[in-house]
């Protein structure tokens, strides 16, 4: 993992088109801004993990193709 130090209003570039800027620092919280193309999904990690778990449950849900075909 690369660890970088940034001060208020300083940025980090990821590739050519993603910019992460430090917007605010209050106590132990840091507010960041992210400029990225709309095609790049951006999630907080806890939300990303929930999405992954939901996708896994959907796959493992035991719904058969036969049951799905009966819906149509």
From Swiss-Prot:
Subunit structure: Homodimer; the beta-strands of each monomer intercalate to form a hydrophobic core, while the alpha-helices form wings that extend away from the core.
Subcellular location: Cytoplasm
Family: Belongs to the CsrA/RsmA family.
Coiled-coil parts of chain: none
Annotated protein name in UniProt: Translational regulator CsrA
One MF term in the entry's GO annotations: mRNA 5'-UTR binding
Its job: A translational regulator that binds mRNA to regulate translation initiation and/or mRNA stability. Usually binds in the 5'-UTR at or near the Shine-Dalgarno sequence preventing ribosome-binding, thus repressing translation. Its main target seems to be the major flagellin gene, while its function is anatagonized by FliW.
GO terms for cellular component: cytosol
Gene for this chain: csrA
Principal place of residence: cytoplasm
Organism: Lachnoclostridium phytofermentans (strain ATCC 700394 / DSM 18823 / ISDg) (Clostridium phytofermentans)
Domain of life: Bacteria
Pfam families referenced in this protein's UniProt entry, alphabetically: CsrA (PF02599)
Hydrolase as UniProt keyword: no
Keywords assigned: Bacterial flagellum biogenesis, Cytoplasm, Repressor, RNA-binding, Translation regulation
Record's keyword annotation contains Cytoplasm: yes
BP GO annotations: bacterial-type flagellum organization; mRNA catabolic process; negative regulation of translational initiation; regulation of bacterial-type flagellum assembly; regulation of carbohydrate metabolic process
């Amino acid at each position: 993992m690369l660890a970088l130090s940034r001060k208020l209003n300083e940025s980090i570039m990821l590739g050519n088109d993603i910019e992460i800027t430090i917007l605010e620092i209050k106590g132990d919280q840091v507010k960041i801004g992210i400029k990225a193309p709309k095609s790049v999904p951006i999630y907080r990690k806890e939300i990303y993990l929930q999405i992954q778990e939901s996708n896994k449950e959907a796959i493992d849900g035991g719904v058969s193709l036969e049951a799905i075909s009966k819906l149509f």
